[in-house]
Structure formats: structure tokens, C-alpha cells
Amino acid sequence: MRIGHGYDVHRFGEGDFITLGGVRIPHKHGLVAHSDGDVLLHALSDALLGAAALGDIGKHFPDTDPRFKGADSRALLRHVVAIVAEKGWKVGNVDATIVAQAPKMAPHIETMRGLIAEDLGVAVDQVNVKATTTERLGFTGREEGIAVHAVALLMAR
């Protein structure tokens, strides 16, 4: 077994929605990113890559590469799962914490879990997503952006 940790942050910018866990959520701002800015899927991808000792998403999908401009992070996550599997690993479970003052995540979490489970090729009960605020402290509390911590457990195939 192997464990990995992922962390990602994106700041708010222009736009009227964000994408988290593959779910489009209306919001007064968008997230600034080279890809679609799905900070949740980026953190999960990093956790999986870390557990397999395969680097991070910046190594596999550099923001200097125009092929990944506006990329669908669900497609990137599925690619990560494939390369992790090529190295002999399968997903045991993943757990993520979204750190954001707004928007409220609770109405979207079950949909996120379902989409993530689909992309990972696992059951929904192997995926946990939760959200918290920082009680208006720090950059997330000031609503300057969103952060996500994620952990992944990999098991030999």
C-alpha cells in the first residue's frame, strides 16, 4: 500500500461559475487557471501521483503546454488513474477537504463524489469529499481563492 497527499490552490478571477469535482457551480467569480481550474481534481491527481511516486500534475500536464489550455480536469484525472494503473496500482480510497468561504459546497458534494468515483473506477464509498471554511481568516476566508487538501491510498493490483 502507498499513500499520497495533494494540495492545490486557485485564486478567484473573472467569471460566473467554478468547476469543482467536475461540477459546475454558479459563483460571483471564476477560478484563474491554465486548465478548467478544478482545484479539487488537481489535488486528487497530485495525491494519486504522489502515492505512486510519479511526480505531480505540473510534470505531466505543464501549464506552459498549450495542449492543456482549458483542459477538462476530469480527463486529466482519468489519465492519471491510467498511468498509476500502468505502474501496478489501484485506488483504495481518496479523501479531500475543500477550503473555501464561498460558495457553499454541501449541495454539490454527493454529485462530486459520484463523478470522482466514475473517473477513478471505484465505488462511491471509496470517495470522500468534505468542505470547511477558515472562519474568514486567510486568503480563503477573504474569498480570494479556494484550496483543497487530498489524500489517496493505493493498493497493488
From Swiss-Prot:
The record marks H34, T133 as: Transition state stabilizer. Pfam families: YgbB. PROSITE patterns: ISPF (PS01350). A divalent metal cation binds at D8, H10, H42. Keywords: Isoprene biosynthesis, Lyase, Metal-binding. Its cofactor is a divalent metal cation. The keyword Lyase applies. Transmembrane segments: none annotated. It catalyses: 4-CDP-2-C-methyl-D-erythritol 2-phosphate = 2-C-methyl-D-erythritol 2,4-cyclic diphosphate + CMP. This is 2-C-methyl-D-erythritol 2,4-cyclodiphosphate synthase. The gene is ispF.
